[in-house]
Swiss-Prot record:
Phosphoserine PTM sites in chain numbering: 166, 169, 295
Protein name: Serine/threonine-protein kinase PknB
Membrane topology: Single-pass membrane protein
Domain PASTA, first and last residues per copy: 356-422, 423-490, 491-557, 558-626
Modified residues annotated as N-acetylthreonine in this record: 2
Record EC number: 2.7.11.1
Protease found in the keyword field: no
Cytoplasmic side stretches: 2-332
One Pfam family in the UniProt entry: Pkinase
The organism of origin for this protein: Mycobacterium tuberculosis (strain ATCC 25618 / H37Rv)
Amino acid sequence: MTTPSHLSDRYELGEILGFGGMSEVHLARDLRLHRDVAVKVLRADLARDPSFYLRFRREAQNAAALNHPAIVAVYDTGEAETPAGPLPYIVMEYVDGVTLRDIVHTEGPMTPKRAIEVIADACQALNFSHQNGIIHRDVKPANIMISATNAVKVMDFGIARAIADSGNSVTQTAAVIGTAQYLSPEQARGDSVDARSDVYSLGCVLYEVLTGEPPFTGDSPVSVAYQHVREDPIPPSARHEGLSADLDAVVLKALAKNPENRYQTAAEMRADLVRVHNGEPPEAPKVLTDAERTSLLSSAAGNLSGPRTDPLPRQDLDDTDRDRSIGSVGRWVAVVAVLAVLTVVVTIAINTFGGITRDVQVPDVRGQSSADAIATLQNRGFKIRTLQKPDSTIPPDHVIGTDPAANTSVSAGDEITVNVSTGPEQREIPDVSTLTYAEAVKKLTAAGFGRFKQANSPSTPELVGKVIGTNPPANQTSAITNVVIIIVGSGPATKDIPDVAGQTVDVAQKNLNVYGFTKFSQASVDSPRPAGEVTGTNPPAGTTVPVDSVIELQVSKGNQFVMPDLSGMFWVDAEPRLRALGWTGMLDKGADVDAGGSQHNRVVYQNPPAGTGVNRDGIITLRFGQ
């Protein structure tokens, strides 16, 4: 299935502006309102997948509910009917601009002032979204645009969820491999998320626009996700010169691992950004520099040593006291020695035999993306082995289950096999051409497919009621859960012949081409029309015929004139009039007719009748009154 060039007879699609994980965005023209728009269309290969179809519709619902100047507006939604089924689309405001990702990649880090202004506007957009019950869940530089007028626009609520539905992991609705650098720790663990998760992701974006790189990078999404959960970010000022400690404080508070330690709303984060922009200290705690940290530790160490005291005066001991003192010291030395030996023995035992193992319950990671599931299991101390399997119910790169199974108690450090879905089993579509629909269903069922839909399409007469193709096509692999559209021949397409009388042959043929007719013949006919002009067709205009029919164009010889009304005229007046029209033929004067005295010698009968075509060299019959 391909994307049509027009949607709902209103939107004319133009160039592709970009691609997403499940859609493509076109520049389009709204033919009704005469304005440019951006149209997001679900990828044709995903349109038949119910999970992607529902997710795309959820994006439309979420985005349409958000009317804010810093959020890309949604104008319309709909579904285009195609031979393969409905194709959903979203019509959005067209923003002529660039994304933060493109700006950082081409121009490098922003100035602190500009970065604060941009992210503060993004905070307003997200706060509005959160107040309306929608968490974005995929905040990243590629989803924030700067328009040609420097307006900030947050877009792509493709995996957004209502807050009431946020108990599900982000990865239960979309793979996050492409956005691992902006995941919150709770997203990386597969825990439930709330508005503070968007705050963390926006903190990652602020970090990147200030320094030119995200807070965490790695060789794989799993390693990046692990850092989000376990590692502290390097302060931005240590990555890029010219950044203040106050700006460090705002960024690092947004990037707090524990959501309770972050800004609780995007509005709080914006308020601190405004303070820093105005030269005021933020409410976020200041981050100590290395020098300040060293000075503080040195001061603390000095306080722990305590005030200096003078030594006690030495006292002389007698022999008994001296022996008692020596004996006491000896006993304490022995005790300390024994404890030291025990410590060494216990340490060796732990290192040698692994110490006391503890049982850990295997978490339930079914339905999570493989990256999130692996991070969750590794955080529990498990070793991981992955095994890929086809599955009709779990999306690709998401977890089918684990071995041992979820909620099983195992020893910490054990190996867990993570069964990762490759999606529904793929099989080859057999060729069912020329079969009946029932025969085609039987053959496709034997090949492992189980969902079918019939579509009719014009065909040659001999293929009426026979299969002329499938979608997906024969010999192409497809998921066994996909609907196979069986296209049955309905015979030649039919059209009504339009009226082309009065047109030249070339113009008439072009107009007939518009209706689908391509086969023509010509016949010269007597006609008063100018020579070469079409007088009609055979079959006549208005007749419904197959589009592959031969249409005969009847072309005027230009050899006739229209017979005038000669009634009541004397012959001496009638003849010049006929000659003036080009008549060169003979007069057939019939017997006079008794028509009363007033009609004496006047025309009382003519053949051909008035208004009909007469050959210029033809015979005209007239009768006169007596």
